[in-house]
Amino acid sequence: NEEEKVKWQPDVP
């Protein structure tokens, strides 16, 4: 899911 991605890329572009 997307949570697995956001763990290494918080909210930085």
From Swiss-Prot:
Tissue expression remark: Expressed by the skin glands.
Sequence intervals crossing the membrane: none
Keywords: Amidation, Amphibian defense peptide, Secreted
Domain of life: Eukaryota
GO CC annotation terms, alphabetical: extracellular region
GO biological process terms held by the UniProt record: defense response
Residues found modified as Proline amide: 13
Subcellular location per the Swiss-Prot or TrEMBL entry: Secreted
Chief localisation class: secreted
Protein name: Electrin-2.2
Species the sequence originates in: Litoria rubella
Lineage: Eukaryota, Metazoa, Chordata, Craniata, Vertebrata
